[in-house]
Amino acid sequence: MDLHSYMQDLGRAARAASRELARADTRTKNAALLAMADAIERDAAKLLAANADDVKAAVAAGLAPAMVDRLTLTEKTVAGMAEGLRQIASLPDPVGEMGEFAYRPSGIQLGKMRVPLGVIGIIYEARPNVTADAAGLCLKAGNACILRGGSEAFRSNQAIAACVHEGLAAASLPTAAVQVLETTDRAAVGLLITMPEYVDVIVPRGGKGLIARISAEARVPVIKHLDGNCHTYVDVDADLEKALPVCDNAKTQRYGTCNTMETLLVHEVVAEAFLPAICQVYLDKGVELRGCATTRALIGADKVQPATEEDWLTEYAAPILAIKVIDSLDTAISHINHYGSHHTDVIITENYSSARRFLREVDSSSVMVNASSRFADGFEYGLGAEIGISTDKIHARGPVGLKGLTSEKWIVFGDGQVRG
């Protein structure tokens, strides 16, 4: 069978399975999730063996050490996959929720009901644990899914898929509800993102190049973010003792995450008091600093490299930080909206009016006051789990949890009313 026919068959099976899932009750979906978790624990040795083969091949192919690290499963990460599925089972089921009821002058009562999206295509790279996470989230939200993991994790993903299918079958749900592509042909991605008759939304998780390509070529909606160029602005009215640990955590807790601060903006009035202290923290932790002329004058040209225009635009995902001293809240908002990626941005201030204005005018999916940008996360937001973070303005925005994998439809109750 050729690739086009294979993908069409996959899509048809997913669409049929999605209709069955939409009818499944919470108890059945939870039973499947728990059975998946049990299967993963029981078959842990098989998963680790398959993963060891993937890792061996990746090392032989010269895959970057960071990618090999993401690819590698351990007993702990396998246990974490099982626990993650059990946590998803414990979350409230959004499907079928009704609300916003109101009576109209005609006598009809209308409201909204939350329903599954249908079929979700998820494209990701080296992390095999995403296979279990994505399958669990889509299932709980009543969606079928088609998963295309990185070719370097092919054996691992197939082994995890076998456990997922075992759990679905144990709960008498169609195994086509979760399908992991059984091909490493990259052309399959191009077909997956251009099947609107079978796929309702695409969620890409990976590098900027992958996401940009999918966004440009997809013929179905895409839930995505391209960059995590996050800012923290230390305002003229900031409590500097509060600002220090927040700015430290936002940059140094983890360097490679999309909610890590990449640019620090500091009001000129507090720069002399604040920058030497926070920059020493960064330097002690091995962070490379790139700053404006004022920053370099305050800290020392030998300690701070000159920042370029490109630095204000860059998500480093590394121990590198851009620093700029600015003259006002207006300038901070303007800088963030011009250079930022609409992900997560923070103001440190004790001024209520300034905080309100920052919240209102900064055009990002998460905007924070006096807290680290590292909190922009589905778990920290109480969503329990997330499929990713969206910086788009339509449908889901910010961390996308179970509700973000559903939509709403209008429902109307009447008693024989007709329109006059």
UniProtKB/Swiss-Prot annotation:
Gene3D superfamilies linked: Aldehyde Dehydrogenase, Chain A, domain 1 (3.40.605.10), Aldehyde Dehydrogenase, Chain A, domain 2 (3.40.309.10)
A single GO cellular-component term on record: cytoplasm
InterPro entries the record matches: Ald_DH/histidinol_DH, Ald_DH_C, Ald_DH_N, Aldehyde_DH_dom, Glu-5-SA_DH, GPR_dom
EC number(s) from the headed UniProt entry: 1.2.1.41
Keyword entries, A-Z: Amino-acid biosynthesis, Cytoplasm, NADP, Oxidoreductase, Proline biosynthesis
Compartment(s) where it occurs, according to its Swiss-Prot or TrEMBL record: Cytoplasm
Example of a GO MF term: NADP binding
Single Gene Ontology BP annotation: L-proline biosynthetic process
The keyword Transcription regulation is annotated on this UniProt entry: no
Catalytic activities: L-glutamate 5-semialdehyde + phosphate + NADP(+) = L-glutamyl 5-phosphate + NADPH + H(+)
Pfam entry (one): Aldedh
CDD domains: ALDH_F18-19_ProA-GPR
Pathway assigned to this chain's UniProt record: Amino-acid biosynthesis; L-proline biosynthesis; L-glutamate 5-semialdehyde from L-glutamate: step 2/2
NCBIfam families hit by this protein: PRK00197.1, proA
Described function: Catalyzes the NADPH-dependent reduction of L-glutamate 5-phosphate into L-glutamate 5-semialdehyde and phosphate. The product spontaneously undergoes cyclization to form 1-pyrroline-5-carboxylate.
Stored PANTHER family: DELTA-1-PYRROLINE-5-CARBOXYLATE SYNTHASE (PTHR11063:SF8), GLUTAMATE SEMIALDEHYDE DEHYDROGENASE (PTHR11063)
Family the entry assigns: Belongs to the gamma-glutamyl phosphate reductase family.
Identification of the protein by name: Gamma-glutamyl phosphate reductase
Lineage summary: Bacteria, Pseudomonadati, Pseudomonadota, Betaproteobacteria, Neisseriales
This protein's encoding gene: proA
